[in-house]
């Protein structure tokens, strides 16, 4: 039976998040969908071209409402605070409008990426209606804030944790993308918790042979490619030391496909160390083009900072990398490490040791082409 479904998300098309697929799937089942989101500005911090004003549009049975907010800008703490709060207040006002003037929704789904404020909206909506509420929890607060040193005060962390626990109590079910997160959620939430694993982007599964990208990559180099957000949680400081290790031999070339808060700082550090000649930054790339870019790669790179909460997280890009049939070079622990090792689809450095990582990459480079390709096929 078709339902009326209200979806809150911090990110939506043209921003590249899994919620885009979920909306398509739910919409294809004749459900009436309303997506409440903001003007896209992630990860560059600037509004996307042709998306600079609040607007609403209807596509068959899907309504999308883009609410106003202050863009992330350079990603500094003050700009992020303005970005978070401006969208939060826009959401609260719009939720009041929905509750008072719009026909009741049967289900509310919250796609939670930072900030957690997005998860508060069903509390307001439930003043007027009593829908089933689902939280797709992809970013565990306040631990994530603590892990990337955004908040260092233990008192503030404790306060935020109490707010999160209070908010959870309004949900009927929480969806998690990693089994490792279940124990964290169970300590706060007594209702239903369901494992909802990530999947490879449909564009990856439907690779077009017509896609052609020209990259000026030096010949006779082993190319390691990273795609996605270039942020603080990706542990790029360790990677700088690894890039430095290979600098004398000049046999590895690094390609970074994406954008993010840490990108400029990362490039600055590479330049200071005189390593920039071994790297290429493409900037933001539509996910549809990732398969074409990956054809230049001998291996795909994946990393997360060494932190308890990140060690229990399964990065969404892991499924994408596996679907690309490329060997994986990973710096992480936990569930992601287990998947890569058990599938024999690449190498993993779990001790946050750049020298160990460098030696493993060196061994990977020395593999016969057939064995290297087999790692990708295993994925």
Name each model feature, range by range.
Residues 1-58, 243-246:
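N-terminal subdomain of nucleotide-sugar transferases
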Residues 39, 180, 198-199:
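Carbohydrate-associated surface elements
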Residues 117, 124-128, 154-174:
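Membrane-proximal helix-turn-helix segments that form the acceptor-binding/catalytic region
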Residues 217-234, 240-243, 255, 376:
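Conserved donor-binding/catalytic core segment of Leloir-type glycosyltransferases
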Residues 234, 286-293, 298-322, 329-339:
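Nucleotide-sugar-dependent
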Residues 257, 264-291:
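Nucleotide-activated donor-binding/catalytic signature segment of Leloir-type glycosyltransferases, i.e.
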Residues 363, 370-379:
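A short, well-ordered alpha-helix in the C-terminal region of glycosyltransferases
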